[in-house]
Amino acid sequence: MNQALSLNPNLFQPNWKLLQPEVQKYFVENLFSLAIIQKQTRTQITMDLLYNQLSTKEIPFITDLLQENLPSVLRTTCYNDLGLPFHVEVRNTEIGHLFEHILLEYLCQNKIRKGAKRATFAGRTKWNWVRDPMGRFHIHLTCGRRDADILSPALEQTVSLMKIILGYDSKPLFLLNTTTAQNGLKNGERRC
């Protein structure tokens, strides 16, 4: 009997395409694209910058913009190599890392608005421009399917703020002489 089962390769073979999470793709003007996969307990976002601005170092007014539009993001916890608080790190951090922190803040705000007493979400932004195209960030969040109802509005809010930040002035916001590392990892967390 066992032998007969093993001879049939299609028996008990799941359709892997049905088990794979759906990738949602978004293009944000000429600024960046997002490929989002929401899993049971986490969300993966691949962010591709569509221009050569890689760092907030090239946006000297970044702290003022955040203070005006989302001051609470400056209080998010940041785990970086130098141990800098986010309100300092934000002056010279990668665009993908900034996106992560803004999204974490909006996730917390939306969860509390929905009725939660507390909210904690963590994120990790990685990049490796030796392996991947320059400007690609891999963002992992502790926001799974149970929070699917707050992810979509948080993404919309994050994209709106990123459009303000990256399109603040019609002049080029980037310097050709950037000193961003070819690969790296940064983590963040927001507790409300």
Give short role names for the model-derived ranges.
Residues 2-52, 151-156:
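Polybasic, low-complexity association/targeting segments
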Residues 9, 111-116, 148-151:
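Intrinsically disordered, low-complexity coil segments
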Residues 21, 26-39, 61-68, 115-138:
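Catalytic zinc-binding patch centered on the HExxH motif and its immediate surroundings
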Residues 48, 53-58, 100-101, 105:
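Long, Pro/Ser/Thr-rich low-complexity/intrinsically disordered regulatory tracts in eukaryotic proteins
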Residues 52-56, 109, 146-148:
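Generic "edge-of-domain/loop-turn" microfeature
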Residues 59-74, 156-170:
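A common structural junction motif
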Residues 70-142:
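M16/MPP (pitrilysin/insulinase) zinc-metallopeptidase core fold and M16-derived inactive scaffolds
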Residues 121-192:
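Metalloprotease/metallohydrolase-associated module, dominated by Zn2+-dependent proteases
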